[in-house]
């Protein structure tokens, strides 16, 4: 069977959400189709793109590709849609501006099976504006159970990640109310349940530095991380130790957020968030979404 023929039961489902990134998408999709491991389906969700994404996708004739369309609803919705439509035992996420080395799926799947893992990630190479950059120690990927570290910062990159259905059924889906930090949200929900395997090889290329990236568009990432932690506290799933860690990190993140608001003269915004968080820490019943009420999502 040739590489471009879809087997009846693909073992891996590659998930690529995309919005107005036709040029980068071709590189990402090409790196997926160029894998040495071939028993996969590749689901691309066009999340309401207004550029020539469909024209670029039409250039690919590989039968393993499935193209889905939806109105623009964000990356969380697009990923969830694709995963609902997928049939692989394993799910591999790939952002449309990143790339994989050819052996990524082969080595990662073998590693997951040999170590009996439910989720693992590879190491990655960072490329910013076309040039490779050095990663700071802060973002060095750990392995095992690292819930406390995950609360502080996002240490799992979607494009590096592969997980099985057991993992997804336990902690999914991505929160579609979040235009950003949806990965942070999923990882802190899973961080006290599943150890994360780390394949040391740098098998993923993570691109950055472009103005269209959410990093450059979202008004406040801290706000969405605060929302995520409040949701986690609200879930009642945490044990005593995890509960204290989450509360401590919530207070720290709120401190950063309030300080930023004060510097920018956004006193009313700061007061609204502070009231909600104080209620949460005092054990009062608060809807997590209250912390987002009236908040500006994007800059400009």
Which residues make up each language-model segment?
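N-proximal low-complexity "stem/linker" segments adjacent to membrane-targeting elements
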Residues: 1-33
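Acidic helix N-cap motif at the loop->helix transition within catalytic regions
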Residues: 23-26, 51-59, 99, 103
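Conserved donor NDP-sugar-binding/catalytic core segment of glycosyltransferases
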Residues: 103-134
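A conserved acidic beta->alpha catalytic loop
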Residues: 31, 38, 46-55, 73, ...
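Short aromatic/hydrophobic "clamp" motif used to bind/position activated sugar donors
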Residues: 91
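Conserved nucleotide-sugar donor-binding catalytic segment
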Residues: 84, 140-228
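Glycine-rich, basic loop-to-helix element that forms the pyrophosphate-binding segment
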Residues: 70-86
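C-terminal subregions of glycosyltransferases and related glycan-biosynthesis enzymes
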Residues: 2-7, 208-300
């Amino acid at each position: 069977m040739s590489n471009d023929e879809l087997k009846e039961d693909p073992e891996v489902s590659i998930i690529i959400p995309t919005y107005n990134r036709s040029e980068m998408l071709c590189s990402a999709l090409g790196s997926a189709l160029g894998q040495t491991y071939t028993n996969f389906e590749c689901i691309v969700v066009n999340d309401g793109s207004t550029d020539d994404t469909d024209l670029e996708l039409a250039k690919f004739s590989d039968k393993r590709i499935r193209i889905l369309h939806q109105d623009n609803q964000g990356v969380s919705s697009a990923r969830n849609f694709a995963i609902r439509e997928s049939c692989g035992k394993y799910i591999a996420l790939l952002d449309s501006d990143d790339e994989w080395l050819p052996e990524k799926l082969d080595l990662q799947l073998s590693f997951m099976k040999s170590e009996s893992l439910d989720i693992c990630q590879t190491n990655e190479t960072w490329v910013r504006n076309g040039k490779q950059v050095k990663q700071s120690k802060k973002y060095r990927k750990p392995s095992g159970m690292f819930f406390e570290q995950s609360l502080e910062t996002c240490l799992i990159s979607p494009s590096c990640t592969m997980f099985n259905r057991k993992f997804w059924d336990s902690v999914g889906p991505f929160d579609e109310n979040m235009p950003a930090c949806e990965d942070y949200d999923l990882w802190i929900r899973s961080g006290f349940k599943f150890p994360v395997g780390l394949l040391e090889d740098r098998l993923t290329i993570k691109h950055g530095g472009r103005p269209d990236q959410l990093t450059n568009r979202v008004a406040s990432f801290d706000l969405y991380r605060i929302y995520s932690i409040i949701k986690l506290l609200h879930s009642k799933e945490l044990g005593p130790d995890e509960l204290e860690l989450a509360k401590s990190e919530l207070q720290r993140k709120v401190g950063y957020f309030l300080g930023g608001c004060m510097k920018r003269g956004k006193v009313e915004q700061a007061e609204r968030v502070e009231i909600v968080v104080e209620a949460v820490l005092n054990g009062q019943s608060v809807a997590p979404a209250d912390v987002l009420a009236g908040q500006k999502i994007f800059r400009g």
